[in-house]
Amino acid sequence: MPSISGSFSGKITQQFGMPMTDQPNHLLGIAEVNGTQKSSDPLWNDSRISYWGINDLLNGEGTQTGYFNNVHPDGGRDFGTFEGKVSGAGGTMTVEGTFKFTGGDGQYSGITGGGTFKTVAKSETEIEATWTGAYELAKAQAG
């Protein structure tokens, strides 16, 4: 499987939060983030990512799960799921976790693989993300 790594600056384009009353400082939230990938792998460089993360936080710490969609410059796309741990240490929200490709179309149809990621909130509406992993396209699997 080829290794990949990359980064992107993302803008939070929509977000909603719901305070829970079961215990103090419990919050469920959902956000949509959009950005442009930067990677040394030409298949991923300049692809447009959208992801939707669901946070379950208690006192600013907890979990994030969600879905991602990458639209590549060649018109194909890959998509998948992710999960991570949310930390508010030092007053900056970070999420570290894993992602998994679950499908795609175009040359990305049948993609397998995944990896790890880290996002850091730079403001209320901006994040910086880094990621690393591996993937295999179906045509490489068949060959």
Residue ranges and their predicted role:
Residues M1-G143:
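Beta-strand-enriched cores of mature, soluble protein domains
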